[in-house]
Design a protein with these regions (language model features):
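Hydrophobic alpha-helical segments, especially transmembrane helices
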Residues: 4-5, 49, 224
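Intrinsically disordered, low-complexity boundary segments flanking structured domains
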Residues: 9-11, 51-55, 181-182, 191-193
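Active-site-adjacent loops and short helices of periplasmic peptidoglycan-processing enzymes
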Residues: 16-154, 158-167
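Penicillin-recognizing serine hydrolase domain
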Residues: 19-20, 24, 92, 116-291
Length: 292
């Protein structure tokens, strides 16, 4: 029976073997600390930072609306959405759902809202990466569900720096919780980053990411100057969401950033539903069934 479990696990794609990160001073454009900064790894939903940039730069209708349809379903990992299907929504609400709660369906719908096919939108994402000098970066979908979406911490520094120029990204990065308006529906969504969700740090750029192949990722730039410098922490393949939060907090504090009102990280019961990543209970149930 144990061999059957091992066989099932062998079918699951593996993820990168080591954490890589950069602590970056965005005021003086210099690396403060790093480990394997050019290591290329899957980035998961960190992808959505590029999706947001490409949408904002190519959408010509600031009042656009679009409905989530079956075309926006996740056929890679099987994730779901809290948002209603076939209900026209303001694009700004979809952008909010994507950046605050990392909603995959919203990411797919936004690529259509920009007046392009999904393939055309992804081509724009790769074109933008080349323009920014992100030569180790490749995109295959707009949500980050594909493990073929790859980048490095140093490439993501360039994306983070570019994102600083977008007022919409700056605002949405720091929302701890929000109600998404979809027709008559109002859907509560919380930030996937515990540091923002629990108001431990304010963010000016903030995007988490997780799939099994990537580990837990984060692009984070602190909103408030740290000893007169704007400091960011970009890390890939953290071992857990909790470790990602503590690692980022420790690095920020090491370089002069202070937690809001001296707040610390505490576990909160039931908050797992607000974390990024997809539901792996199906795999766990299958393993239990085979091994039982």
């Amino acid at each position: 029976m144990f061999k059957k479990v091992l066989f099932i696990l062998s079918l699951c794609p593996s993820f990168a073997v080591a954490q890589s990160y950069v602590v970056y001073d965005f005021t003086h454009n210099r690396v403060l600390e790093s480990h394997a900064p050019d290591s290329v790894q899957p980035i998961a939903s960190v992808t959505k930072l590029m999706t947001a940039n490409v949408f904002l730069e190519n959408n010509t209708n600031p009042n656009c609306t679009i409905a989530i349809t079956s075309d926006d379903r996740d056929y890679i990992k099987g994730t779901s959405t809290k948002l209603p299907m076939n209900v026209p929504m303001a694009c700004r609400e979809l952008l909010k759902a994507m950046l605050v709660h990392s909603d995959n369906y919203a990411a797919h719908a936004l690529s259509r809202a920009a007046g392009m096919s999904r393939i055309q939108f992804i081509n724009k994402m790769n074109e933008k990466a080349r323009q920014l000098g992100m030569y180790s970066t490749r995109f295959h979908d707009s949500s980050g569900l594909s493990s073929s979406n790859i980048s490095s911490p140093m490439d993501l520094v360039k994306l983070a720096k570019h994102s600083l120029n977008k007022p919409e990204i700056r605002q949405l990065s720091n929302i701890s919780a929000t109600n998404i308006q979809a027709g008559r529906h109002s859907v509560l969504m919380k930030n996937t980053n515990k540091l923002v969700r629990d108001e431990i740090f304010d963010a000016v750029v903030n995007k988490t990411g997780y799939i099994r192949e990537s580990g837990y990722n984060l692009v984070f730039i602190n909103k408030h100057p740290c000893k007169s410098s704007t400091i960011g922490v970009i890390s890939l393949n953290n071992s857990s969401s909790a470790y990602r939060s503590s690692f980022t907090k420790n690095k920020l504090e090491k370089y002069g950033c202070t937690a809001l009102n001296g707040r610390t990280i505490h576990d909160v019961e039931g908050e797992a539903q607000y974390e990024d990543g997809y539901d792996e209970e199906g795999l766990n149930d299958l393993i239990k069934k085979v091994s039982g």
